[in-house]
Structure formats: C-alpha cells, structure tokens
C-alpha cells in the first residue's frame, strides 16, 4: 500500500500548490485592475476624509507599500488562516463567509444529492423499463440541459409556492424552500451526470463480459445492479467532481431566484462594491473546494477500480 | 457410427439419448437489419456428442452461436426453429428462456481477457454460476466453485477466487470461464473459438480440458472454430460454413476422407497443418542457396528493459535468399528480436550485420541507408496502413522518401510492384477501407517490396487473415523469394505455417534461443523438451 500512500501524498502536495497559485493569481489580477477601490472610496467627497486621514488609513492597511510586499504579507496571513478585513463593512472576511457558507453548503449538498438520485433514476429507467418508456427517458437529459435554471426556479416557485402554497417564497431558509432551490440546481446537474451514465451503461452492456454473464442466466435487474452499474459509475466520480464547480457557479443564480443569502449573494454584493478582500477570499475558497473535491476523486478512484495502477510498471512484452 | 451411438460406449453418464437429439436446428436464418448473414442452417447434435462449426470470417459461425445462446445484438433477428432438449426455444420469451441459460446451455467465449467483469472479483462472478446448481446450499457454493477451479486445472483456487480478471493470464482466465460454464452441469456447451486468443501450448491444454470434461460430465460440445485441424481433432462431426450457408456436413472422418464440396476441398488444401509440403517446389529454390554466405548475422545480442531480459544472447545467421523463422509464444522475445534487427532498438551487447553492414553504432542517416535494404511487413494489415491514403500513395511513399526516380517512373514502379503481388491496376486509387484483409496485406508487401530490398522481416504476416487468404499470401511471398532471391525473417507462433515456408528455424523462449536448425531437423528430431512440447501442441488434424 506504500504505492498508494506516496500517490496520495504527491496529489495532496499538488493540490496545495494549486491553491497557493490561485491565491497569487487572484491577487495579481486585482492589483493590475484599473481603479483602486480604497482610494476611490476614501476620496469620495461625501465621506469627507482629509488627505492626512486618507494617508493614515492607507498606511494602516499597508496599501502604500510595493505590491510584492503586500502580496507576501497577504499570503502569509492567508497561510495562517487570516483572510483579512472587508473594505465595506470593516468586518473580518472569515466571519462574513462563515455567516453565509452554511446556507450555500446546504444548498450545494442537497442539489448534488438530488442530482445523483435523479440521474441514476433516469439511467436506470432507460436501461430497465420496456421500450416506449426507455426511449422517452433517453431524451430527458437533453431536455433538462436546455431549460435555463432560473426558469425552472421561477416555475417551481410559481407552482409550489404561489399555486400550492407548500412554502412561502420569502421564508427562504425553510426545509421545503431549500428543497425546491436544490431541485432547481439539481435538475440541471443531473442531466450531465445522467448523460455520462447512460452512455457508459450502453457501452458496458455491449461488452463481451455482459453477454457471458447473461449466458449464466442473470436477469436484467441483476445484470444492471451487479455487473453494469459499477464500471459505469466510475467515470461519474470524475464528472461529479467537476460538477461541484458548476454547483457553486449555479448557486449564484439559484440564490438570487429564491432570495437566499449565500456565497452567491455575497459575491454579488462584493462585486458591486468592489470589496476586494472578500472577492479574493471567495475565489480562493472556490479553488480550495474544487481542488479538494478533485483530490478526493483521484484518491477514491484507485480504490474503486482494481485496474488502475499507480506506479508505472516495468515494461513487459505481453507476458501471458 | 452416429455421434450419439459412439457416445454410449465411451461415457460414464448413462445415455438417455438415443431418441431425439439434444439440439436440433432447422432453417435457422439471421439478419442484421436487412443484411442476411445466416441462411437456412440445419444442424443436429446428440447428447454427449460434439459438433464443430467451421468457417472463415463472415461465414456466420459466431452468429449461429449467438443466435442459439440468444445473445444477438439488438439489431439481429433470428428466424427458424431451434429445439433444445425437445423444446422450441427460439420464440421463447426471455423470461422463460432464462432458466435454461447456464443450466442447460453453457457458453465459453472467444477472448477470455474481456469475458469477465473487470471490476469484480472472479469469485463473486463464479458464485453466480454456482447459484444455478439446484439444491446447492448457499454456504456450499464457495466450496463448489473452488472444487471446479481445481477440476479445470487451476493450481491455486483460493487465489483465483480472490483475484480480479486482470491479475490472471489468458490461459488461466479461459480455465475459469470453462469452469463457470460447466459448474451448473449444462447439457450443451457452446464454445466460440475458445483458444484462438491463446498461445499454442495453452491452446492444447484448454482443448484437452474441454475434451476431458465432455467425457467425464457427458456434456455435448458445439465448437466454433476457423481452424480445420482443431475441429478435426476435437469433434465427431463437422459443418463447413461459407457466407452463412452450409457447404458440407457429416462426420469428421467422412468430410476428411471425401470432401464433396469445392469449398471444403479448398479449405482442406489451405490448412498448413494438413499440408506441410504444399510449397515444396518453391521452397526448394531457397534450399539450394543454404550454403551461400549469410545475408543477416546476429551474434550474441542481448537487450534488457529494466529487470527484464527480453532478448538474451541470441545468435542466428540467414543465408541470402532463404527464410529464417523465429518461433515462440507470447513473451518469448521474438518481437524485441526483430525490433533490434530493424534498428528500432539498440542492443545492450552483441552485433547485427545486414548485407555486410554493421547495424549499430551508426548515425541516423547511414542507418537510413541500411534500412532501405531492410523492410518490414507488419502483423495486422487492418492497422498498419494509413486509412486516409490511397493504395498508390501508400506504395509510392518509400520511393518518395528515398527520392528514387522521377514521378513517372515511380508511378510505373508502383504499378509493376502491385502486379507482382497480384493486385490489379484498378485498385491503385482505392483506400484501405475498400480492400479486403488479403488485399491490404498484399499492399503492405508491395510497399516493402517497392524499394527492392534484400531482406524483408515478416512479423506474423498472416495471423490476422483467414486460412484461404493466408495460403494465397504465403504463395505470393514464396514466389517472390524464388524470383528475386529475397531473404526473409519470418516471425510466427504458427509452427505448421513455419514448416510450410521456412528453411531454418530458431525456437525462442523467455528471450533465449532454445534450439535452432533446419526445418527438417527441428520438426523431425527436436532435441529440446520445449520444442517437443510446442510440436506436440499442434493439432494433428485427421481423426
């Protein structure tokens, strides 16, 4: 298992490097952007700061020093877990993210769960149901993909909140409202997983081993569950890891439609007000999530598929 | 003597079978979409009997097997009658056919490496077969599987049970698959080319195993094969198929003694194992050159990859105008040996001299000039030709590379070379996809020939081709050798083919030459145990 340990360590090391690079890159992009939000704000005549006060504030935040020094300080703070202070509210960025993160995490987790359940249900239906139903189900993923998320959200609110009164559209964090918000996001994500899964099931079902297993008298359900599902699901792990990014992106719209206060909402406000430390933190957070999830996918894969080997074996001429 | 009568005298299981045959097929036709691939096939197989379906690619033999097993792809439609143990099964709904799967009708597939689910352990898949045994308690299933593994000659059943398919060799996997097929004691076993993906010594062991199990367990065998010699050795009756129709049917002895159809006669004449001296005349031309100076000299060549010694102190010499065969099973080092000979790999030690020129320690440019005299015909004509190029360009490319002649003379040379390998003018503007396998390999040979090389390395040049096509290609190669005095290095696992066309042989095993000599001395009086094993593995044909 030392091969696996080394592999895990190597991948984890790469992940750390990616996160640090993302942080530096975001910092750089922000520093070269035209317009300096700090001075724009301070020099706004409505705020009535004197030049002396401005200079004091600028030096307090270290903004008068060279960019590289600022980067170094910001990076060393980041490494110790200090994300800095918001320019708008003067509150700790970590606190601000901490406030909205749970809501987004709940939404993301719920929508991914819904997406997985939905996509497996669709793929199962395609492969198990008799003909007219399975053919109809095959087109469902394309349908899901082509309807914009906000439209689905508005429809769901119209029908289930205003129409049936299952939840109040303003009571945004209740379980029922959360479910429908997650459904909005999940439907779209499920389509992409289902497409991969259906294609994989088709592929596996046409393999020689599937025919041989059928010749052992296995029924359709057992073929599906015992033989085809696992090899077909393996690539889904990778797709799922990529979907995490989509879910975070999609959360911005979904949160807006359902009026939830989450990371998406925070990003929206911070962009509008050029609250750079918050943006920097959110981008880095997104990178961390992305990297961690993909790292997990990489680490899980060799455990799921016995054929995946971690070390290049010495080249051997097909030794039977 | 009909198969079912012979059975009563040799089998331990009481024959309940002198009445209706176990499998009775009449008027079976199969179509994919609108394309008819099997037309009106009749066959009968008694309990405990054995029947071989023989044919080349496209003959419909595998389609018949799949139709009987009801494993045709969704586009396939089978019509006609299939009676299994007195019951019509072709029209049976899947739900009612399923109980027959495994229990009555077992299946041994062609390529063992792809016939087991790669992400599940062998044991878990074997337990599925054990479930089909009526009255076997759940806790006894594992024991039954391990017993079966031992029975099919797997030495470490526990390890096999816990292994994943990719951890076992092809021969072991085929044993597993045979074990899984016979575990529920079916009355009929359908084996679709069960050994064509395996090395010759393993092939023999697997066929022996099938024969033994058939005798011990009284299972009928429907053997699908392209190899007439195997069929003759292993089946009581034969059916010869071509283009989905039966050409000839009868007991093996009858068909061999007295083939009535032209196709069966031709097939018989084309099988190398049955006709060792078919090309004796053409070969005699090279035989006369045996004393000539060597065109190729390989002296003490060794090549290692990491800890693996792929080629270990190999030496051989090939007189000009003769054929030297390198024979061995997978992993024997024959492929590495020819890569060294072609200058594609550098040896760790030893020297290789081609036409008086040292091959190694050369600059790129001078290696190129040696290569002009040293051409390769690759194993698989379906992958060795660029599918987007026309035949003309494929054959002309070496001339362009070496800047030989002007465009007009190149064109003429291409046509002349194509004629010499038996390809007509009309093919020059075709792409490989519009050619048959045999035509493609002729193009590959023409491409090697167009530079007028001294030496051609033939790497299993016919292993992807049908036997009748193989015979044509071999004949072409030998005629070219007789006319042009070419020197061949012929790499093959097929000993019968080697016997037909080679003059001298090196038998390789795990990188070493275990024995070398003239064809006659190797085949008639082999000195080494391994050579004897290889020769004993050859199907001898006539029963």
Predicted regions: what they are:
Chain B
Residues 69, 342:
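Helix-to-loop junction immediately C-terminal to a conserved catalytic motif
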Residues 89-106, 124, 132, 254-259, ...:
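ABC ATPase NBD coupling module
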Residues 140-159, 409-426, 535-536:
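Conserved ABC ATPase "signature" region
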Residues 185, 452:
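Conserved catalytic motifs of ABC-family nucleotide-binding domains
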Residues 249-250, 516-517:
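ABC ATPase "signature
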């Amino acid at each position: 298992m030392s091969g696996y340990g080394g592999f895990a360590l190597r991948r984890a090391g790469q992940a750390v490097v990616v996160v640090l690079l993302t942080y530096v890159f975001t910092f750089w992009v922000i520093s070269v952007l035209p317009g300096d939000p700090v001075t724009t704000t301070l020099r706004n005549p409505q705020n009535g700061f004197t030049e002396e006060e401005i200079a004091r504030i600028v030096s307090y935040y270290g903004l008068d020093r060279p960019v590289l020094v600022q980067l170094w300080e910001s990076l060393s703070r980041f490494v110790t877990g200090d994300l800095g202070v918001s320019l708008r509210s003067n509150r700790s960025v970590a606190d601000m993210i901490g406030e909205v993160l749970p809501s987004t995490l709940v939404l993301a987790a719920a929508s991914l769960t819904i997406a997985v359940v939905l996509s497996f249900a669709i793929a199962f239906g395609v492969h198990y149901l008799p003909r007219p139903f399975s053919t109809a189900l095959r087109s469902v993923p394309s349908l899901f993909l082509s309807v914009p998320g906000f439209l689905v959200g508005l429809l769901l609110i119209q029908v289930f909140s205003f129409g049936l009164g299952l939840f109040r559209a303003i009571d945004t964090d209740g379980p029922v409202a959360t479910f429908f918000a997650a459904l909005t996001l999940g439907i779209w994500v499920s389509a992409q997983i289902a497409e991969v899964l259906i294609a994989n099931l088709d592929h596996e079902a046409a393999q020689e081993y599937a025919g041989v297993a059928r010749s052992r008298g296995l029924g359709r359900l057992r073929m599906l569950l015992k033989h085809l599902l696992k090899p077909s699901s393996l690539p889904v792990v990778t797709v799922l890891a990529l979907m995490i990014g989509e879910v975070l992106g999609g959360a911005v719209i979904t949160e807006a439609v359902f009026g939830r206060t989450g990371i998406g909402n925070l990003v929206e406000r911070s962009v509008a007000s050029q609250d750079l430390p918050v943006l920097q933190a959110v981008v880095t957070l997104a990178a961390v999530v992305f990297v961690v999830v993909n790292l997990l996918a990489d680490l899980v894969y060799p455990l799921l598929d016995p054929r995946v080997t971690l070390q290049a074996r010495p080249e051997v001429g097909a030794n039977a | 003597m009909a198969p079912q009568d012979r059975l009563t005298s040799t089998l331990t299981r009481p024959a309940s079978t002198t009445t209706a045959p176990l499998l009775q097929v009449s008027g079976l036709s199969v179509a994919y979409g609108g394309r008819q691939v099997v037309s009106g096939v009749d066959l009968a197989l008694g309990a405990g009997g054995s029947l071989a379906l023989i044919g080349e690619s496209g003959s419909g033999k595998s389609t018949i097997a799949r139709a009987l097993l009801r494993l045709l792809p969704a586009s396939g439609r089978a019509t006609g009658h299939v009676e299994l143990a007195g019951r019509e099964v072709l029209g049976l709904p899947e739900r009612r056919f399923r109980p027959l799967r495994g229990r009555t009708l077992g299946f041994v597939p062609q390529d063992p490496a792809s016939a087991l689910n790669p992400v599940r352990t062998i044991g878990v898949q074997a337990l599925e077969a054990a479930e089909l045994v009526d009255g076997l308690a759940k806790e006894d299933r594992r024991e039954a599987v391990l017993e079966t593994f031992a029975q099919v000659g797997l030495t470490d059943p526990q390890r096999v049970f816990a292994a994943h398919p990719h951890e076992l060799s092809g021969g072991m996997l085929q044993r597993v698959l045979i074990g899984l097929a016979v575990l529920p004691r079916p009355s009929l076993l359908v084996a679709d080319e069960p050994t064509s993906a395996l090395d010759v010594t393993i092939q023999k062991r697997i066929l022996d195993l099938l024969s033994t199990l058939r005798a011990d367990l009284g299972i009928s065998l429907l053997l699908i094969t392209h190899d007439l010699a195997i069929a003759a050795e292993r089946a009581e009756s034969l059916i010869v198929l071509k283009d989905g129709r039966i050409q000839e049917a009868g007991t093996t002895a009858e068909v061999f003694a007295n083939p009535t159809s032209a196709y069966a006669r031709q097939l018989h004449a084309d099988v190398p194992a049955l006709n060792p001296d078919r090309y004796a005349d053409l070969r005699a031309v090279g035989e006369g050159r045996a004393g000539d100076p060597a065109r190729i000299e390989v002296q003490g060549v060794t090549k290692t990859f990491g800890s693996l010694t792929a080629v270990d102190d190999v030496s051989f010499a090939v007189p000009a105008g003769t054929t030297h065969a390198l024979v061995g099973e997978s992993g024997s080092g024959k492929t590495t040996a020819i890569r060294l000979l072609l200058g594609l790999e550098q040896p760790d030690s030893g020297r290789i001299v081609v036409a008086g020129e040292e091959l190694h320690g050369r600059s790129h440019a001078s290696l190129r000039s040696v290569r002009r005299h040293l051409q390769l015909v690759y194993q698989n004509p379906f992958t060795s030709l660029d599918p987007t190029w026309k035949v003309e360009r494929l054959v002309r490319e070496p001339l362009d590379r070496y800047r030989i002649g002007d465009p007009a003379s190149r064109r003429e040379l291409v046509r002349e070379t194509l004629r010499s390998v038996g390809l007509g003018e009309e093919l020059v503007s075709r792409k490989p996809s519009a050619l048959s396998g045999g035509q493609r390999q002729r193009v590959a040979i023409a491409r090697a020939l167009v530079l007028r090389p001294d030496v051609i390395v033939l790497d299993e040049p016919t292993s992807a081709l049908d036997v009748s096509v193989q015979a044509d290609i071999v004949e072409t190669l030998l005629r070219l050798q007789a006319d042009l005095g070419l020197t061949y290095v012929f790499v093959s696992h097929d000993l019968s083919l080697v016997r037909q066309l080679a003059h001298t042989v090196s038998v390789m095993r795990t990188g070493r030459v275990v024995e070398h000599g003239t064809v006659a001395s190797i085949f008639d009086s082999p000195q080494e145990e391994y050579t004897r094993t290889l020769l004993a593995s050859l199907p001898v044909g006539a029963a």
